[in-house]
């Protein structure tokens, strides 16, 4: 029996964990490690940002859903990989051993690379995460109270910003 750790509980990690369970059956331990207990369906973030969806319509509780498929979940995130001992160490200090490690962490947002960007203190909005999209909706509502010019675009180095233009 193999111990498989899937690092990242976003679109890639959730899909990978479910696919592994389906292909490998119940004979192997699969542990999904993500930061926080909520999964947000990223492709729906633009709809959240314009008010076509509510946050609860595009999020779900990870532990409850993966648990039904015999997949363990840890919501503390991975603090570090201990490759010498074949284990990940979570943000809560738990050491989770693995025989196989699948890294599905997704992008690391780097708004600090371009001054003035980012939803936290910048002059821009984002739909990269569900909380960002919810904040963008709130900012849009405030904008409607005092309208002005709008610029839509992406900064150099941005990847996969197509969904924002939907």
Model-derived regions, located:
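Beta1-alpha1 glycine-rich phosphate/pyrophosphate-binding loop at the start
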Residues: 2-72, 156-166
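FAD-binding core/adjacent interface of flavoenzyme oxidoreductases
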Residues: 71-165
